Amino acid sequence: LMKKVLFVGLLACVALSTAAKKKLAITMTGENLATLTQVTDNQEPCLDPFGGDNGSALFFSVRENGKYFNIYKKDNPFSAAMSQKTSGKNNNRTPCYNPATGKIAFSCRQDGASSADIYTMFDSKGKALSQITESTDAFEEYPSFNKEGNLLVYDKIQRSYYSKANFASFFGFGYSTIVVENSEIWLRNLKTGENVLLGNGYQPCFSPDGKRIAYVKYSSDAKSTSIWIMNIDGSEQVQLTDAKKGFALNPRWSPDGTRLVFQSSKKDKKDADLYVIDVDGNNLTQLTINKSYDGQPYWTTDGYIYFVSDRGNNVGNYQIWRFKYE
């Protein structure tokens, strides 16, 4: 298998064109985010925002003691209080929440473990966990629920496909490079326990109607990543973006399912910006233009985009921000 280079953590992604191989003009009007607001102001980085729809709970991960990560929740995005949902010397990352079931799903790499698994827990029942996947030689991460909460999609990367020199940094923090030969997207039926392999890819995300999945895939030359969509049975895989010298990561759906927001940067840059594209590959628009890292977006049902950034005076200390986008 051809090796693929993945910049993990906060290094992101790309310059683009479309699935139809036609050149796309990028709309760039300059950063004009009148509603831009900082949501967290923590001494340590806050990552992986999920939620905040119509002022509801916001879930995210927080680095602790410069090493570990745990999942936290704000009942209101702008409340000062944060409740801790996970604990211990683990790396608990990429939370997602399903309102229909009241469950949180996240990826956990326990201290000293050489793998990571998907866990779920009821938001209202504290820290009682249910282990969904069980692997001793793979990283399983980026869970995403369908609307009903009975299906969970996630990615899986075999432990042997990582560069041993960089393995320790995968669920850590920073710009470390990890060599990946293959990543897979799996669909789990939470009622029956059935697992189905959908194909190769990374960072899957269910569409609002539960009929499609957005995800990241490597180019054939292994020098870039692009955004794709497919049906939930793995059929009709369509490429939306094409980056020859960069990376596109973290696709998230608009509330109506017609657009995707994602982060993008050239591979020789540590900064990243946010972009929006229609699901037919048209109307690529750059949202942020900043020398900081702007990534890990989440698009709420009331039109806000939450994202992670070290802009302003927070260079190196990544916090959660949001702005209104219709």
Outline where the language-model segments fall.
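Conserved beta-strand position repeated across blades of beta-propeller domains
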Residues: F50-G52, C96, S144, C205, ...
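Eukaryotic tandem repeat interaction scaffolds
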Residues: N195-K266
